[in-house]
Amino acid sequence: LTDRLATLCRHGAGVKRLGRAKGPAIWQYNGCQMTSTVLAILGGKRALGGKVMEESDLIPVLRRGLPSTAVDELAALLGFTREQMAECLALSKRTLARRRGQARLTAVESDRLYRLARVLARATDVLGNTAKAARWLRKPNRALESVPPLTLLDTDLGVRQVEAVLGRIEHGVYS
């Protein structure tokens, strides 16, 4: 899965070369690539059910609730235990254990899991592979007041701050 994820990040649908000049390419991102990568992280189209072609197609899926198996998919990519995933999703261990017996997460839990998957996809794209991305998410970051990026992903503001740091890294700005 990690090789497939890295391939999707680097060469997925939705990325096109701008201009006809020879030499270094200038690439444009149009949204499909990130959606494909997030889908792969969460278990693929088959696991999510329905036809998901772009990010807006995920809204009804998130409202319905992601399959509880998506937690295990993401935990495996990050190298996390279910207890660590419970912490990332701001859930108690007991609540996450109950979800394992159920078919779906709640809409709120699904949204949190989606945010985590989206940040992992972005970090994988910027840093080159899933292992580096997972390590970066767990390591304290000076640009984020010396806290691990993963600890900020339980809020929308935290996610935006982490994505901003990834954007700076991507563009070569010291972070």
PLM segments and residue spans:
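Non-transmembrane "mature" sequence context
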Residues: 3-8, 12-175
